[in-house]
């Protein structure tokens, strides 16, 4: 496997450096015909394949229509927009109905998606718009991972910026199972690529600080498949739960707060309430400490239709919930509730309570319990998470919890203690005790609570909440000058 990935990455770089087309092993994508070009006839499926070409065409049409639904509602008509043109050309023609050659039939240029909504309040502006030209001299191609449909690679652009490339995985489950069933490589390629196209549309329509930024896309011919699609996105780090459990509570809370804000946005998105049918940690990435959803090809906007509450059972491995059926014939809040319970079982229950400040634990426990019982919706959940942030950032959580110390500490400005470290948990540094504090009184309180602490060094570095980072030490036998730090040592003991 390691050898295969190395070979894939090597070929990927070589294809770009030579200025040739993207290699299908690394940047596969959709197989829409070029504008004005009729779809090529596919070979008839082999014997025993159920449904045949008609069934495959039905599935392609269903996915195409789904992408069309999500792409509607932009700021203007699709005419003149390159991605909209490409999408229109993807429409499979009906039996015996030839598709007319459009007047703008010519090779399309690459660029940004053609239907970006105006950014709403708090939404990030559009990122740099990249296309095929940006990918011709990339370096450092590295395989990051793959799922059922897509493979992800990390590359460095000529300007030095690192981005992620997503493309249909030729070795993936979706493409392989389709080819085994229908025996039609290009048709199956198109079917799989519509999931990537759907994700591209949703990344643009759902723009938010906790949705991965779409930077652009590229269509290029690749081997025997014309117009393969590669999307170019913001680069994030995979979510590794075991590693997160070893980080500070402040960083873990930031992830949960990010998730709460994301779920609130999905519940009130321009498309309606969006649910993530595949809600595992691997569907998310971390970008500068913020959690962002990256995999949207299994997202769904439509609520579940119902005739009664028996049709509105939300099933999970550990338990089920029955939701009401509205008078309009839809399960009330099923999309929102599914997201919320998944946030509880994959994130909140592990990351929120452990090693939190004692005065915040009752509120954190109530958040975990309420989401685990689906007693709250996303609005109330986010309001409570924002309350925790306010209490923590303002220092109000310290009221009645920081005892006045009888021990005096001597201040030594512009100095530090280079050694005499000890380990504590959780710490921002694995080899020492590096914690964040709201003020000097909290630093003294922490030192007093550690039996081995005899001194601490206040740095000029702060966390995302504005709290200062402090090293706690076992002694002060060697104090050296440092203009960016201040040392405090116990006056006795």
UniProtKB/Swiss-Prot annotation:
Residues 1-32 form the signal peptide. Keywords: ATP-binding, Developmental protein, Differentiation, Disease variant, Glycoprotein, Golgi apparatus, Kinase, Nucleotide-binding, Osteogenesis, Phosphoprotein, Protein transport, Secreted, Signal, Transferase, Transport, Tyrosine-protein kinase. It is found in: Secreted; Golgi apparatus. Pfam families: PIP49_C. The active site is at 278 (proton acceptor). It comes from the Eukaryota. It comes from Homo sapiens. InterPro entries: FAM69_kinase_dom, Kinase-like_dom_sf, PKDCC, Prot_kinase_dom. GO terms for molecular function: ATP binding; non-membrane spanning protein tyrosine kinase activity; protein kinase activity. This is Extracellular tyrosine-protein kinase PKDCC.
